[in-house]
């Protein structure tokens, strides 16, 4: 079996650790309990969280025991962002988000067997602690000069807004999490992103002060980046969420399908569970025929299956093919079709007019004369059927599920018309 540290390094998942040799020894000596934390700062995890969630899954498959922490306490504070203070959410909202995040994380882990996963909430050990107890038992062991060196804190101190004592104290809470999990579960490894390094080591320092002789470790993964310099995890419409109500499975699939050729091989190593041989073959295909997007399809299919399930992934693939003329649109169920069409330009009309008007309405043609030219050149399609007369209105019987028409100009330009109340 491949050494898990070597595997993480090969996949680009190893940014740094506190003591690599000591970590390797701990992993070789026996089962290691580790944890990774997720703060409920929104109603859903987003694709940026997949690095940590899937790394937890990878570590569990290698024999480690995971503790998945959802921060009912830290979520009420918020890790300092480099730019501005977070908006505080009320405790009831955070409690609801804790449950939603638990439900998203649990399917990725195994809760049976010798290294069964455990879900934990840091509100369990902070809720009953008074401010005096926190300052005496935890705050006493932190040094402000060291806390000030954390990147996000330093940047905020240089800004006009500065940083509140609330957010400045966040690293004390995260440090206490590691201490409590060490005491309660024998947790000796914390996993997180490299931007969390200061918080990871804060917990180690606290344990060393209060538990002399304890051997504990931190492991940081690199931040996901994009070759074009834009922020990873954002589409044109905003963040890409794991919740299907916030980002449809179709949009989720398309996000990965549209990954830049310069990024796709790296993303596959980081996020996929395919073997080295399979990944090497996909890298080769990308070099030889990038236009086929084989690597992107493999990435999109695997991650959509992991997040939304195989049945939903199959429906999304069928919709993706059908929209571009490689399948029967009429075979798509209404929910899948509606979700897919929500991601393309569309217009709502009270009744169907001539096709040339519809092409202009949805933006597939700049004018009626442009629409007529598209039809004349054989480039206009309604529900994947080529149109020969643009002056005729589509028949109501052509409406998919009684409400949709899919219009296409050429091979790739899609739009939709929905018949219904306007306004």
Swiss-Prot record:
The keyword Oxidoreductase does not apply. It is found in: Cytoplasm. It catalyses: tRNA(Tyr) + L-tyrosine + ATP = L-tyrosyl-tRNA(Tyr) + AMP + diphosphate + H(+). It is an enzyme of class 6 (ligase). Its main location: cytoplasm. The keyword Ligase applies. A motif ('KMSKS' region) lies at residues 231-235. Homodimer. This is Tyrosine--tRNA ligase. The gene is tyrS.
